[in-house]
Amino acid sequence: MKKLVCILVSLVMTFSVTGLAFAEKEQKNETPIIIIPGFMQTNLQYENEDGTFEKVWAPDFLGKLGIVGQNLPDILKSALEIFNDNTEAFGEALMDMMSDLMPKMMCNPDGTSVYKVLPYENDPAKRNMHHIKHSGEEYHMQGYYTFASYICDEGYAKEENVFIFEYDGRFDAITNAESLREFVKAVKAYTGKEKVSLIGVSYGGQIEAAYLHMFMDDNDIEKAVFNVPALLGTNFGDRILNARVEFALDDIVALIEHMSASDTELSTLLKDADPEFFSRLLNGLSAGISEYARYWSSVYSLTSVEYYEQLKEKYLDPVASAEIIKRNDIIHYEMMPKMKETLNECLNRGIYIAIHAGSGLDLVLGGDENADLLLPTEKVTGAVCAPRGKRFSDGFTGAGTECKNPEHHHVSPSMEIDASTAFLPENTWFVEGTPHAMFQFDSYGLELAAKALCTDELKDVHSDPEFPQFTTSKNVNFGVFAKFNESAPGYITKKDSSIIIENLFENNKIKVLSVKAKGLDISFDSESKKILSPGEQIKISFNGEIPNKNAVRAAVTVKYIKYDIISSVAERTFDLTVLNGEKGESDGSIVDNEYYIKDSSGMNIIKKALTIVGNLFDLIFVLSEFLTGDAFRYLM
């Protein structure tokens, strides 16, 4: 329940940054590291006439309870309209309150700030981790403090060599890339180093790409790691500004559980909630957002090209907003079309590139693309993906447009992603089931990012079998992780003779009840009475023959129960591809994914009425938590 706050917050501050935990290393990375946070993840301050500064973002809701009280009557009145199926009024009332709470965040039609609002000063002496940690500034760093502190505390980098780039999240990627250039120069001068390494998260990844597109000739980048980067945008601007939200509640529940990073099964709290309720609420919010943020140039930078022209025509005057249009035209018609070319040129010049993406989830605001909740996987990586509920046909081993090596298999175990078509097939990793920028809650994602940024161990997706191109999340809320003993996660070959199951819980023991395969004529010996402690593994052998086929879809489901508490039987299904024969014939056609499960059950009138009441109480709790500012420690 506590983390449900993300339902409201994430739609304003869509692109969050992650924290990453790393194992201790004997030698610290000597190259300065610059962290580029995600959308609205940096601090903004208003300069008063007397030269003092007032923090305006992230806002201090707890200190503005008077404004909340003034708006409360309208909020309560509009809340009653929910029972008349008018959720939009409630959303509009909430948006009015948000406008009162953050009046200085408005921008002019040309994209400049109405008020003198500035990012924190990008002084390397103040924006390095040593200064930040010892000046008591941890809270103001929001969520990405976790990322920076881990790479320092676990020995990957020195505190004085890790820097945070502060920028105005309302501004476009071109403007922020120009500011990043100045910060890179300042960090080089401060450290005496000739090059720096960058890691950009979400919108920070788009800013990073803009920097490389415009300033690669500066020759000052050693590594560029992209964590769920918004390289080609998303449908956020279209869905919010045009009030076309279709809420993906099931995947929001997954996000809540992921953020909890606990053994608690939070999905039961919202299993009967009505997605339409939240869709109407958010569309009510959208009416206010479209006026409040229509001149935030970043909204257009984050919009994918298929929606950009329509939004530009509807919300931007060609004269008054000429500067917003000019800079975003560069992004959509110069930078994005040349993304593959830019990234490959980086590799040719010796710049290390790694792209980390999430997959296997819906777009939270609506759409049928394979995504990480906020960004379509295809627009993060360039890889062709089947729509949700679909997959490539059996026998498909990749179109091979970017990787033509017949020995490389770049199709995901779910047969939904063809990484052979990605911008960089050999330098792109996918983690299924990890929500957008939530790698700090996933042990695999943490170590993957650590190795890419701070070591030379992962030159490409073939460097280490422990870090294959495709895998599934190891967040504790999933309970178990499974792979076959001789193959990469998600694949099975004739070499395999057993399945390895790991208990992901941190506090609970489990007992595996059964393991069953679909699409394979094999059976598992699951009569073991062994109880798995947290982190412990068990190897279960199977009987039967692996078919002599290649690139054939299958799945395996593990059922288990928590051993030391009263709980229901839980299960997790793992995507599986058989790789055990000659290369088959496939035209790459898209077929229905028989392994895709989407709850589409309806609700009767009584159940719907009870759900509305429950949703309303949920939102009251969400609002109270939101106002304390506690949410920002998770989402920022």
Spans of model-derived segments:
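Short strand-edge motifs at loop-to-beta-strand transitions and within beta-strands
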Residues: 536-542
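N-terminal non-catalytic accessory region
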Residues: 24-199, 206-259, 362, 372-485, ...
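Alpha/beta-hydrolase fold catalytic core
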Residues: 155, 160-163, 171-174, 288-373, ...
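Sec-dependent N-terminal signal peptides of Gram-positive bacterial secreted proteins and lipoproteins
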Residues: 4-22
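Short, solvent-exposed loop/turn segments enriched in Ser/Thr/Gly
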Residues: 492-498, 550-554
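Asparagine-centered strand-capping/turn motif at beta-strand->loop junctions
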Residues: 501-507
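Alpha/beta-hydrolase-fold enzymes
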Residues: 249-320
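Short, solvent-exposed loop/linker segments at beta-strand-coil boundaries, enriched for Pro/Gly
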Residues: 516-528
